[in-house]
Regions:
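A short beta-strand-loop structural module common to alpha/beta enzyme folds
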Residues: 1-11
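Alpha-helical cap/lid subdomain in secreted, periplasmic
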Residues: 16-170
Length: 170
């Protein structure tokens, strides 16, 4: 059985608030792709506290909470996807609070998740790198707006994680 709990525009804070739903279902596997909206969310009242470290720590907290409350669930954290600021003009700058380019924030989040994976109960699926073009941006082949995947992007994603899905359900 597959249950999609993805919510458009969701943040790590939203997922943390809804973990009881996951505990209820006790899934065999869980594929987590979250974090980009945290760094996009400039309207958050806690914007100053949202950093790559805090986003990565929230993602890890989600995985660890699921393991603690549903120990048979295999948690797979998918790395945050790159963006293409040439296509999505609003992404060309940085957030004024953190003078770190968005692409670098994404890389920092992914780096922290990867480094801490051996100490925690999750597998990392590195999606970020398979979507990069030669300029280290989200390839135009996989997006029409620089942020969201298009049909080709979803096909690449599903093909890449299919082995993890097979492993999780066996």
């Amino acid at each position: 059985n597959i249950v999609n709990r993805g919510i458009s525009g969701d943040t790590t804070f939203g997922v943390l608030a809804r973990l009881e739903e996951i505990y209820y279902y006790k899934p065999t596997g869980l594929f987590l792709l979250i974090g980009i909206n945290d760094i996009f969310n400039t309207n958050s009242p806690n914007r100053e506290s949202i950093t790559p470290l805090s986003v990565a720590n929230n993602i890890i907290s989600i995985a660890e909470s699921i393991h603690k409350n549903s120990s048979k669930t295999r948690v797979h954290i998918q790395t945050t996807l790159p963006i293409n600021s040439r296509l999505y003009k609003e992404l060309t700058g940085t957030f004024p609070i953190h003078a770190i380019p968005l692409q670098d924030q994404i890389k920092q989040i992914n780096s922290i998740i990867k480094k801490k994976s051996s100490q925690n109960h999750y597998t990392v699926i590195d999606l970020h790198d398979i979507f990069l073009d030669s300029d280290e941006l989200l390839s135009r082949e996989y997006t029409s707006d620089g942020v969201h995947l298009n049909e080709e992007g979803y096909l690449r994603w599903s093909n890449f994680i299919s082995n993890y899905i097979s492993f999780t359900t066996s």
